[in-house]
């Protein structure tokens, strides 16, 4: 596919340095440049002398003063060499798939002067000066003329101009358009449009491997396991991260805690995430699950810390615990916690964030992990339907890059796409290939936010490269019984087998699973 970039020249690639003193005042000069006389001159319908004489008559001044003022303006014209180099690199990196065109409101005499301001014009495949074409921006006819000449589908054309009227005309014809205001911002947008966002994101992660650490919103470095685990799950690349695993349970911090108490307990959030991602022996998982069950509060809700002196509860922490339980077929051991997070989802109690998390998208994203880990059945089916409804409600809501990536991933996990959100996410990519830091979680006391560009980038790459997955949410009849048996067997496999009775129950459960599987095969053969 060949794409096209159409650029304005004046005030985009070339800049004017206004002369300190001119025969014509700056106010009058501005009026001249916006007059219909100047428009006709730029279309090539008036000669230079005709235009200057008409302007002198209109604005009660001498034609020679008009001419001298524009001579001074021409002399001040300067090529932006850095922006030109950027454009050359952009075109070179496209490997022949990008054509660059100039489209400028400029008279024939002024265009001849402009050509002398640069030695090398090979950047452009063609230039369309209004004085030679007989039309000018924002005339729709001028845009249609250029589109016909370059023979590129309008959806593959990007237009850059510093004038909003011109940009509006281009957009009305279906062109993707960038209003030139700040050069750095335009360069970022063009890099995102014509580059490969995913490849650039992966390059950023690779260039910063093992240094993708967190920081507070006040730029204080934070060494934490949680952010590393999120990067690991999103990328499946252990070489990118540096963690400090716990022997059994995990701590949020790597090394000494920061900006909190001198000693900091292990927490259920980090531990559950780790046991969902990092291969761990069943005996360890089983012992942690049993301890978590024993730590439920009077409402049957799991806490945040393995420390009874810190009775904190957060619905997203609960969801992450349930996700780990579901991975091992044990979600039924926390019925009150399941019921509570379902109520949080149903009543949209997550919209204002939670104690430790700032965005609604964080709750929805982590909830999709929980639903994904559930075995097919009524619970999965009901939660999947409600969660899908809640995620759809958030589509196109303005949020930061991380929250947007979380939302897109949630959409994909639930089986539908979010093309508008993906397009927005791509525009947020920074020039270095990473995505902006955004608050992932926060300190419970005071609410100081913790960010990580590595997490933002890893999540963004996964979001834009992902696609909706087909999910099975419910199995009825004998299939449901087979799944139930398998869940029971999975749970038993996590428990120590220390007696003859345990062995007997394990063997019976295994036979139940295999017989159910055989019955399903027979049913399927009848259908086929």
From Swiss-Prot:
Gene Ontology BP, a term: terpenoid biosynthetic process
Pathway note: Secondary metabolite biosynthesis; terpenoid biosynthesis
GO MF annotation: an example: phosphatase activity
One Pfam family in the UniProt entry: HAD_2
Coiled coil (residue ranges): none
InterPro entries the record matches: HAD-like_sf, HAD-SF_hydro_IA, HAD_2, HAD_sf
Highest taxon listed in the record's lineage: Eukaryota
Keywords: Lyase
Enzyme class: lyase
Phenotype of the disrupted gene, per the record: Abolished the drimane sesquiterpenes biosynthesis.
Catalytic activity line of the entry: (2E,6E)-farnesyl diphosphate + H2O = (5S,9S,10S)-drim-7-en-11-ol + diphosphate
Assigned EC number: 4.2.3.194
Summary of the function given for this chain in its UniProt record: Drimenol cyclase; part of the gene cluster that mediates the biosynthesis of various drimane-type sesquiterpene esters, compounds that exhibit diverse biological activities and are widely present in eukaryotes. The pathway begins with the synthesis of the backbone drimenol by the terpene cyclase drtB using farnesyl pyrophosphate (FPP) as substrate.
PANTHER family named among the record's database cross-references: ALPHA-D-GLUCOSE 1-PHOSPHATE PHOSPHATASE, FLAVIN MONONUCLEOTIDE HYDROLASE 1, CHLOROPLATIC
The family this protein is said to belong to: Belongs to the HAD-like hydrolase superfamily.
Note: The various drimane-type sesquiterpene esters produced by the A.calidoustus drt cluster include asperiene C, asperiene A, (6-Strobilactone-B) ester of (E,E)-6-carbonyl-7-hydroxy-2,4-octadienoic acid, ustusolate A, ustusolate C, ustusolide E, ustusoic acid A, (2'E,4'E)-6-(1'-carboxyhexa-2',4',-diene)-9-hydroxy-drim-7-ene-11,12-olide, RES-1149-2, as well as the 3 newly identified compounds calidoustene A, calidoustene B and calidoustene C.
Name under which the protein is recorded: Drimenol cyclase drtB
Gene: drtB
């Amino acid at each position: 596919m060949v794409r096209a970039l159409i650029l304005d020249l004046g005030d985009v690639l070339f800049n004017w340095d206004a002369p300190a003193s001119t025969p014509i005042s700056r106010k009058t000069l501005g009026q001249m440049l916006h007059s219909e006389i100047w428009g006709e001159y730029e279309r090539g319908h008036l000669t230079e002398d005709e235009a200057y004489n008409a302007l002198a008559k209109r604005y009660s001044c001498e034609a020679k003063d008009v001419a001298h003022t524009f001579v001074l303006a021409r002399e001040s014209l300067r090529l932006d060499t850095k922006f030109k180099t950027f454009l050359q690199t952009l075109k070179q990196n496209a490997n022949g798939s990008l054509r660059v065109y100039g489209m400028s409101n400029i008279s024939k005499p002024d265009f001849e002067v402009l050509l002398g301001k640069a030695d090398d014009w090979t950047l452009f495949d063609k230039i369309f000066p209004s004085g030679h074409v007989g039309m000018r921006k924002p005339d729709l006819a001028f845009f249609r003329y250029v589109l016909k000449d370059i023979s590129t589908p309008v959806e593959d054309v990007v237009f850059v101009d510093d004038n909003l009227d011109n940009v509006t005309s281009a957009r009305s014809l279906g062109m993707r358009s960038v209003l030139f205001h700040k050069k750095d911002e335009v360069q970022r947008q063009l890099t995102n449009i014509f580059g490969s966002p995913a490849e650039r994101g992966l390059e950023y992660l690779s260039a910063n491997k093992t240094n993708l650490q967190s920081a507070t919103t006040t730029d204080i470095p934070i060494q934490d396991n949680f952010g590393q685990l999120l990067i690991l799950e999103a990328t499946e690349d252990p070489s990118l991260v540096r963690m400090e695993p716990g022997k059994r349970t995990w701590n949020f911090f790597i090394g000494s805690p920061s900006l909190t108490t001198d000693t900091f307990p292990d927490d259920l959030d980090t531990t559950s995430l780790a046991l969902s991602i990092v291969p761990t022996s069943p005996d360890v998982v089983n012992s942690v699950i049993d301890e978590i069950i024993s730590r439920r509060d009077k409402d049957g809700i799991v806490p945040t810390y393995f420390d009874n002196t810190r009775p904190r509860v957060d619905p997203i922490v609960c969801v992450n615990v349930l996700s780990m339980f579901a991975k091992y077929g044990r979600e039924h051991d926390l019925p009150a916690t399941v019921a509570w997070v379902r109520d949080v989802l149903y009543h949209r109690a997550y919209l204002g964030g939670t104690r430790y998390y700032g965005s609604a998208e964080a709750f929805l994203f982590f909830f999709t992990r929980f639903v994904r880990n559930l075995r097919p059945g009524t619970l999965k089916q009901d939660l999947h339907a409600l969660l899908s409804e809640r995620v759809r409600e958030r589509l196109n809501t303005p949020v930061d890059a991380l929250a947007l990536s979380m939302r897109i991933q949630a959409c994909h996990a639930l089986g539908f796409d979010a093309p508008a959100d993906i397009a927005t996410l791509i525009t947020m990519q920074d020039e270095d290939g990473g995505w902006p830091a955004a608050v992932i979680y926060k300190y419970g006391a005071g609410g100081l936010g913790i960010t990580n560009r590595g997490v933002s980038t890893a999540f963004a790459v996964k979001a834009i490269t992902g696609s909706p997955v087909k999910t099975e949410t419910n199995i009825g009849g004998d299939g449901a019984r087979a799944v139930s048996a398998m869940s029971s067997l999975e749970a038993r496999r996590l428990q120590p087998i220390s007696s003859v009775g345990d062995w007997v129950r394990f063997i019976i459960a295994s036979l139940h699973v295999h017989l159910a599987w055989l019955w399903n095969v027979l049913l399927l053969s009848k259908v086929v």
